[in-house]
Amino acid sequence: RVDRSTPWSLMASPIVISALDSIKVRKGVWEAIKDKPWMWYLEARMGAEVFQLHAVNGDDRDWYDQMLASQDDSLIPDEPCTAKATIYTACIAAGQIGKTVRQIVTGEKPPRLLIHDIVKGVITQIGG
């Protein structure tokens, strides 16, 4: 469990990656790390067949802070557990996260938000 009391030395990395199940927990992790000296924060979200990846540059944190503050678990439809555990979506998500890490380490700027709708076969990229 990561919160404000978690020593930064246990989390310290230039790239922090999270994949959490609720907005409440995402907000807790964000509060624990937002003022720390990381370079990138990658926050992954997955539904049955849709994957989202927020890529937060350490020099541009305000947009994510504002976006996350406006979200609440009660506003997000709950999917049945079996719909959340779609292995091919998780595999695609892992590949997209790996690609984003490669972009960062090779000096490319990844999109702020990547949404991959697997059913429709559509990848939407915002910012970057």
Predicted segments, located by residue:
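Glycine-rich phosphate/adenylate-binding loop
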Residues: W8-G128
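Conserved SAM/SAH-binding loop
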Residues: R1-P7
